[in-house]
Amino acid sequence: MEESLELEKLPRIITDVLKIVLCTALIALAIVLIIALVKITYTLSMMVLNTSSVVPYDVAEQAVMFFLYFGFIGLIVQYFKSGYHFPLRYFIYAGITAMLRLIIVNHESSVDTILFAGAILIMVIALCLVLYSNKLKNI
């Protein structure tokens, strides 16, 4: 009898341990992202203050990287706010931002740029479906 009760508790114990490991890893990741965000902010401010050697693409790339880091920190915050759940729309936001960064950084090939823009369009359509799925069900 006692043994069966312990076996019933085992999945809950494993789940709790894994949740603690996940939360610890996410907190560590948030700290690393905050440090990276501070570095990007410093780099951006130095680029803006030292305008003699600034390449506009470098500034744009750093700005988009800032928003990527900021978005991932926001994703971690939302994970804890929403009861240990990652909302899908935040991953789509991160994907759109990453593709924008790729277009800014890698713009030599026009075919690649069009493909990247198509990927952004697909993600925007997916985002609209996610955001308006409840309204679409009522139609």
Swiss-Prot record:
Presence of keyword Transmembrane: yes
Origin superkingdom: Bacteria
Organism: Haemophilus influenzae (strain 86-028NP)
Pfam families: PsiE
One GO BP: cellular response to phosphate starvation
Secreted is among the record's keywords: no
HAMAP family: PsiE
Subcellular location: Cell inner membrane
Main location: membrane
InterPro entries in the record: P_starv_induced_PsiE, P_starv_induced_PsiE-like
Chain ranges passing through the membrane: 20-40, 60-80, 85-105, 111-131
Name of the protein in its database record: Protein PsiE homolog
Gene expressing this chain: psiE
Gene Ontology cellular-component terms listed: plasma membrane
Family in the record: Belongs to the PsiE family.
Membrane topology category: Multi-pass membrane protein
Keyword field: Cell inner membrane, Cell membrane, Membrane, Transmembrane, Transmembrane helix
